[in-house]
Amino acid sequence: MQHYRLSRRALLARLMTGAAMIGGSANLPARLRAMTAAGIRLTNGPLVLEFDPAMRSRLSIDGLALTAFEPGEALRLVDGRVIDRFIMVDHRDQPTFGPHGPGRRHTLRATADRVEQRLTVTLFDRYPGLALMALAYRNTGAAPLAIAGWHAAMHDLLSHPKGAWSFAGASYPDRRDWIQPVVAGFQQANYMGMNGSDYGGGTPVAVAWRPDAGIAVGHVDTVPRLVSLPVSTQPTGTRLGLSSDQPTTLSPGATLTLPTTMIMVHRGDHFRPLDSYRRVMAERGLAAPEVPQASYAPIWCAWGYERNFTTAQILATLPKAKSLGLEWAVLDDGWQTSEGDWAVDRTKFPRGDADMKAFADAIRAQGMKPRLWFSPLAADPGTALLRDHPDMLLLDRDGAAQNVSWWDSFMLCPAFPPVVEHYKAQIRRIIGDWGFEGLKLDGQHLNGVAPCYNPAHHHARPEESIERLQDFWKALYDQAVAINPQAVIEICPCGDSFAFHNIPAMNNTPASDPTSSWQVRLKGKTFKALMGPSAPFTGDHVELSDRHDDFASTYGIGAIPSTKFTWPRDNDHPLDKRPPGGYVLTPQKEALWGKWIALYRAQMLSQGDYLGGLYDIGFDKPEGHAIAKDGRLHFAFYADHWDGPIELRGLSRGRYTLTDSFTRQPLGTASAAAPNLNAWFDHYLLVEATPLEGTA
C-alpha cells in the first residue's frame, strides 16, 4: 500500500493558491514532493484519471485527453465564495473486493481553508473505463460553515468539429427528448426532483459524447437524491457533472457526505455507460425482476374508444384483435367513478365488482389476457377517500397538496403506511377478485414525488416520500405476483424520463406517450440499457408514431407492438382530437397491422440480444440498431430518405445472406471483410443477416 502524508504544520505554511503551493513544494519530503509536482495518475483500462496537487482533475481515454485539468469538485458557500482549490496531503492505495468484484481503492485527502476534503476513488477490474467516487468534506474550523451547494465530477468534454450529443435522465412537463444534440446555447439542469407539479424523478445519469468518445456521470445511491446532473455548452466543449443547491450548515468537526458518484469514459453513445450503470446497480441490490413470457405478448388497448367507451364496443372488437395475433386486451381509463375511491362506474358495469370479474372472464373467453388500467397515488377532490382520510395527502412545507394536473387530483404520500395498504387492497381486488392478469399503472405523477411535510406522517425527514416511492411500487408488485406469479406489471410514467429506482417493481414498460417515432426508438435503446438487452419494452400505441402506422420503429429495436384501433367504427363523440381517418381499422390497415404483428410473432426480436454498442444513435447516419437472435443478426436503419452505403456491424467470420425482413426480398450477401450494403429507402430498412453454411 502506498501512503504519502504531509504534516499539518507544513501544510498550513503552504495553504495558499494552487500555484503558490506548487511553487513552494521544494521543502517537502522527497516522495511527497514527487507526488505534488506530478499529481496522482489512476488508470482502469481505457480510463486515465489524473489529479494535480490542487486536486484539479483530468479525464483521458486510451491516451486521448477528453478534458483539461479543472476543479471537478467544489463547495459553494453562502457568502459567495467557492472552495475549489485544495492542497493534496495524503494518498493511500490498496486492493479491495466487494459486490463489484476486485479492484483498487485510492483515498486522497486534501485541505483548504477550514475544510478537509476526502475523496475515495475505486476502480474495478470488471468495469474498465469506470470509477466510483465517494466524496466527503469536514469542517476543520472553529465556526459553522454555511454551504449553499456543491458539485462533483464536473468536467468539460472538449469540443469536437462534429459537435456532441447528450443523454439526460430528468423529467420535464414538455416531454422533451431524452437524447439531444448539444447545440450552441444548450443548457439543461436535469434536476432529479420535481420539474413540474407532477413531472419529476428519472435516471440519475448524464452522458455527453463526441463521435470518438464520451463521458458519463451519475450517482449510484440505491434511493433517489435531490441532485442535478447539468449539461451545458461551454466555450471549450460540453460541461456535465453532479451538483446540488441544497443549503446546509456544517458545524465544527462535522462532515458532509455526498452521494457516491459514477464517472465513466466510453466509446459510442449513451448505451454502454447506462448498461454499466444497470449492472453496478444490480450488484448494489437494485435490479429488474424476472420477466414472465406474457410480458412479450403483443397488445390491443381499448383507449381508442377513450373514457366514454361501452363494454359492447370493446367486446365486439376482441375477435378482430385476436384474429390479428394480439394477445393482451387492456381496459383503459374510464371504468372507475374517480381516482382515489376506485369505485366501479355502474353506468358501464351495473353489477359493480361482479361485472368487472365477468368482463375479465369475457376477455379470456376470446383467447386473450385481460389487463386493467390503474393510476395509484392520485386522489380526486371530493372523493370519499379524501373525506375520510385527509391524512393520506402529501403536503408541502406550507401545508398545500401536490397537484396531479392530468386528472385534476391530489398526490398521496407513498411513504405513509396507510396509503400503501390502501393500494395493496386495490391490487388484491383487481388481480385476485376480478381476475385481471396484468396492470397498466399510468400517469406522469408515478415517476417522482415532492418532499412530504405532512405532520401526520411523522417522517424522519421530508425526503422520505422521495426515497420510499420505489418501496411503494415494489409493495404493489409483490402483492400482484403473490396472487398471480405470471402477472404483468407495466409502469407507464407518461412523458417522463423513467425513474430507474422503480425498475424492480415492473416487468414491462412502454414508450409512455411518445411524441414521435424517434422517441420510440431512443426510449427503446435506453431501456435495453437500463433493464437489459432483452427488456420487455413496448412501442406504445402505434397510432402515436409517425404517420400513425410506424410499426418499423417498434420492430427494429426489439420492442413489443401495441395498438388502440377501433372496429368497426370510432366513437361518435370523441373527447380528444383524432388523426385523419381516426382509429378505425380499415381493410387496408388490417392487412398492414396483420403483417407487422405476424412478423413480430415469428421473430420475437424483443427476446433477442439488443446490441446497443454497435451504432451511435446520434452520429451514425442512417440511424442504426442491431439485434442478435437465434444465430441471425437483425438490422434496422432509419432516415427520412437514404441513398448510399450502409455498414452492417457485428458480423462474425464467414458470409451472410441478406434479406429484407418485411418484404422478404433478397438483398445480396455480406461479410465482416465486406460489410457494406448499398441501399435506397424512405423511412426505414430492415435487414436480416443469416450465416451461410460452410463459410465460417
What are these regions (language model features)?
Residues 51, 254, 258, 473-665, ...:
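Active-site-proximal substrate-binding groove within the catalytic cores of carbohydrate-active enzymes
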Residues 276-328, 332, 336:
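An acidic-aromatic substrate-binding cleft motif
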Residues 46, 248-267, 680-688:
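Short Pro-Gly-centered flexible turn/kink motifs
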Residues 325-537:
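Aromatic- and carboxylate-enriched substrate-binding clefts and catalytic-loop regions
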